């Protein structure tokens, strides 16, 4: 099945409500097939859009209109069981959880963490005493990530009072979520100040998806990204920066990511069918590709790559 975008209105208006009703009706026909799927719940880098301290053109409209882009996260949904799982607990956890539970009509069954950078785990605090008071929410983490949560406040309070329980992940070891869905973490090189960093491979009986929101450079990885894309059906890849000139006041060596132009050049020899598997995600506020209708996004699509959008559904 082709990908599908469920647009959840970001502003409260009659037209927005009409759009929501329409998309929910359309979405109902998609769910009738009962295939598991992945939904994109956010596309921005850790700081979101608008970004703290940003008064540049890329943020001005968002500050004035209140429209925003949520921090990157995806949900895994199995309609047969009514269960869902989050990859990463972002600063936008509350609204992303609401989308999973009240738009997609699922029960959150666990959270998989990629690493200990702020956009990927601080949403766990919403599970605590001050907000949800959750009971033993499964949180899946790699060894160093576990140690970080257990040895630092306020995260260790979530454990001590039973808001969360930590379940262990191992590199390249598959975990069964339901009869039809598996997930496998794999290590990727990233700054790793507080924990290791992983991407995820999500597999059903029919299709597979790779999610890598953060990596330093493809050349530093012990896997060949070209081959990884060839052997999957969808690849959501780090698109933090489009090029090196986006934030001239910052030392880019301190925040390494593969530029989108680098990734497109690296994978340019792929045929069009394989390039269309790729969706860039995790856009910095400075990256013009965060605007789905920008000329930069159009350039990416003209090269037969894709730009992820909140609400995108990829059927497994």
Can you name each region flagged by the protein language model?
Residues 5-8:
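Short hydrophobic alpha-helical segments enriched in small aliphatic residues
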Residues 144-153:
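A short, active-site helix/loop in glycosyltransferases that binds the activated sugar's phosphate group
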